[in-house]
Amino acid sequence: MFTTKKPLLLLFFLGIISLSVCEQERDADEEDGGEVTEEEVKRAALKGCWTKSIPPKPCFGKR
């Protein structure tokens, strides 16, 4: 029982950190008027680039 609690606690902790970072980025984005920079566009393109194959393969530059 204790061995399953550690990974779950770690996942919960990492999820909370991730949500906090997203909230900070969202707040910062609202402060600067919601303008999208070129870097954010590139980052979003790379995030959505993974296919559902097993193992996942990146599609660098291909859409």
Swiss-Prot record:
Q: Which UniProt keywords apply?
A: Amphibian defense peptide, Cleavage on pair of basic residues, Secreted, Signal
- What is one term from the GO cellular component aspect held by the record? extracellular region
What is stated as this protein's family in its record? Belongs to the frog skin active peptide (FSAP) family. Brevinin subfamily.
Q: What is its main location?
A: secreted
**Organism in which the protein naturally occurs:** Odorrana hainanensis (Odor frog)
Q: Propeptide residue numbers? A: 23-41
Instruction: Return the Pfam families for the record.
Output: Antimicrobial23, FSAP_sig_propep
Identification of the protein by name: Odorranain-B1
Q: Which residues form the signal peptide?
A: 1-22
Cross-referenced InterPro entries, in alphabetical order?
A: Frog_antimicrobial_propeptide, Frog_antimicrobial_Ranidae
Mind listing the GO biological process terms from this record? Answer: defense response to Gram-negative bacterium; defense response to Gram-positive bacterium
Give yes or no: UniProt keyword Secreted: yes
S-S bridge residues: none
Compartment(s) where it occurs, according to its Swiss-Prot or TrEMBL record: Secreted
Query: In what tissue types does this protein appear?
Result: Expressed by the skin glands.
